[in-house]
Amino acid sequence: MTRKFASIRRLLFTTLVMAALGMCACGPADVGAPVPVYDTGADTTEWASIPAGEFLEGQHETAVSIDHDYEMMVFLVTYEQYAAYLNDALATGTVRLVDNTIVGHYPGDEFRGARHEVRIDPGDYLHVALNDPALRLEFREHAFTVTPGWEVHPMTMVTWFGAGAYCDQYDWRLPTELEWEKAARGPLDGRESNRPFPWGSEIARNNANYYASRDPFESMSSYGSRTTPVGFYNGKIYGAFATIDSHSPYGLYDMAGNVWQWTGDVHPFEHYRYLRGGSKDTYDMDLRIWVRNSAAPTYASPGVGFRCAR
């Protein structure tokens, strides 16, 4: 079997696992279920500097170079941050409320007519569906607020368009796949440069939030739950649950598990966008740095979030 077809089979398997787990999670919504509240001490305004240079890309460890310095958010964008953005963007007209959805303008992609390619013309596209029971945002009295307890959890149920619009608002952007992978793996310096996980060569239940990892949020049954606060796996003890400090070599947290992360690449001949990092609903093997998934840019899920680069 060629590497190309083996890679396709792995991607199909990952997609099927995500779909199956998503169906399992779609029980009766209990949006009022109490959520454990822990202070991780995360400074969600913090950025990590990543210098130009080489790193090992992919499962087959190909040396690749990025020719520019850049920065990425240390933590995933939170519900609290996204609510503040929506209030500003709604006031300035950057986004609009239409039939219980948040939409915004996108300039469109070049359409090349490839098989299965979907045309994305200039126009308004879905950012967030406000009536989804998995969403932890509320719109009351002309303002967005966060459902209590979810303020510092990663923003989820946001499409690629909605993630990109957040970054654009502040003159940032979504990271490319290569930028994301280097931030997760670290430099080509001979010190575990081929690590499969952001923190090293092995994974334990105390490293990240993934399927059956037994964190304090694992038993929550309401649809859309089971994310952990950003930066949760920082070496602290929460009740009886002791975490391992699991940042990447550049100091980024949640680069494996919790939620899949949108990346910014727009590839020719296809409309799909790519996600990295695995999530609370995937097995530990899908938290390896090189694992990719894809979805239409209008896709949203309780297991998908994002962070920005600049």
Where are these regions (language model features)?
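Short, low-complexity, disordered segments immediately C-terminal to signal peptides
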Residues: V31-D39
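Core domains of carbohydrate- and sulfate-ester-processing enzymes
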Residues: L97-A143, N206-P216, M220
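Bacterial signal peptide processing site
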Residues: G27-A29
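C-terminal motif of bacterial Sec signal peptides marking the signal peptidase cleavage site
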Residues: M23-A25
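A short glycine-rich, aromatic-capped structural motif
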Residues: G41-D124, M157-F161, G257
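Short, structured beta-strand segments at or near domain termini in extracellular proteins/domains
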Residues: P302-R310
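Functional-site microenvironments in short loops/helix caps that host divalent-cation chemistry
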Residues: L56, E138-N293, A300-P302
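Bacterial N-terminal signal peptides that target proteins for export
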Residues: T2-T15
